[in-house]
Every structure is written in structure tokens, then in C-alpha cells.
């Protein structure tokens, strides 16, 4: 068998795509792409020397058209990504919550976080035109306090994240901290409705 390239997609407002995962349910609707490093927005050279204008970006590529469907600006970088078996959420690990540029700065905090994306809320906002068009694609602001995201603190420098075959549990593993954080995806609804706190979604954390 020979694998041939079917499509090359240019993703604006982002580079160093690290974690990448197709949507599981109800079909491969999206391909989720994590931006590991920040990029100046707009990325046309005008802000290249101004760190305050740099942003971390999460991208969803439409699996049928292979065009960028939308992007979400987040706090902190995005490492690996996965999604649920219900078609409601995607979630990504984030290290360097300090946004440091040296090893000492970027590993100083005892905790980083997992960023959870509410796909329905994002899609509704895009459909209503509640976005900025940057680089030709819809961009939403998902930084802390946004209705589109939640940030769940986890031990230092999480790396991998995977959904268990039971469709209920999500496991994020630490890279600098030898810890696995286990979430119950069924609690994410209450998290986004502000009925519980972020850490209330954690059901186990073996070290």
C-alpha cells in the first residue's frame, strides 16, 4: 500500500502544531490542532517585536472540506489534545502556564492546567457571527473567563491526554510531575454551568 497526500491545509495565526486529533463522535467532523508556541496576531510582521501581541491558538479543521472552521485564543500553550465520545468537548494539556522564556521561568509553577473546549458553545458563537475574522478565519477569545473554555489545574507540565475506552474517563499525565490526573467527562456540563469548581471534575490522581 502507498499513502499519498490528499490535502495540504494552511493554518493561519498558528505554527508549531503539536497535538493533533480527529473528532471521535458523531463522526470525524473536526481535526483538532494545538498551537504549542505563541504567534503574533495578526501574523503579518507588524507585532513581531511586541510580546504583548503574541497569542496561543487552538484550531479546528473541518474534516469534510479540509478548511479551518474556527480558532480559539487561549491562555498558555497547548501540548497534546483529545476529545470525548459524546461530541461535546475537546481538551488539551498545557505546560508553561508561567509563559516564561527560560527553563527556570517555564517550570517554576507547581501546577499547570488542562484546557477544556465546549464545542457547542463555540459553534453557536461562530454561527451568530460573534467572532473576529483574523487571517481569513473566525477567531474566538477563549482566555480565562470565557464561556468557551475552562481551565483545570493539574500537576506540573502535563503532556499526554487520552480518553478511556469507557467513554467516561480522561487521563492527563505529567511530564515533570510523575502524576496522572483522571477526569470524569460527565462532570464537564456542570463545570461549564458554573455549578462546580474545576478541580471537582478530578476523580483520581495517582502519583
Give names to the regions the model predicted.
Residues 1-207:
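Predominantly soluble domains enriched in secretory-pathway, periplasmic, or organellar proteins
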Amino acid at each position: 500500500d502507498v499513502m499519498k497526500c490528499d490535502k495540504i491545509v494552511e493554518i493561519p495565526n498558528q505554527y508549531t502544531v503539536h497535538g493533533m486529533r480527529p473528532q471521535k463522535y458523531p463522526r470525524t467532523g473536526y481535526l483538532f490542532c494545538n498551537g504549542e508556541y505563541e504567534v503574533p496576531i495578526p501574523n503579518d510582521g507588524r507585532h513581531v517585536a511586541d510580546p504583548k501581541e503574541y497569542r496561543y491558538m487552538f484550531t479546528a479543521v473541518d474534516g469534510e472540506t479540509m478548511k479551518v472552521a474556527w480558532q480559539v485564543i487561549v491562555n498558555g500553550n497547548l501540548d497534546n489534545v483529545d476529545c470525548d465520545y459524546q461530541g461535546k468537548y475537546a481538551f488539551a494539556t498545557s505546560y508553561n502556564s508561567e509563559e516564561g522564556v527560560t527553563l527556570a521561568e517555564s517550570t517554576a509553577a507547581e501546577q499547570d492546567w488542562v484546557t477544556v473546549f465546549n464545542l457547542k458553545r463555540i459553534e453557536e458563537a461562530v454561527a451568530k457571527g460573534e467572532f473576529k475574522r483574523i487571517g481569513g478565519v473566525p477567531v474566538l477569545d477563549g482566555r480565562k473567563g470565557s464561556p468557551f473554555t475552562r481551565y483545570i489545574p493539574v500537576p506540573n507540565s502535563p503532556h499526554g491526554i487520552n480518553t478511556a475506552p469507557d467513554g467516561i474517563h480522561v487521563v492527563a499525565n505529567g511530564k515533570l510531575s510523575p502524576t496522572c490526573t483522571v477526569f470524569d467527562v460527565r462532570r464537564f456540563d456542570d463545570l461549564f454551568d458554573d455549578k462546580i469548581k474545576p478541580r471537582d471534575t478530578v476523580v483520581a490522581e495517582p502519583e
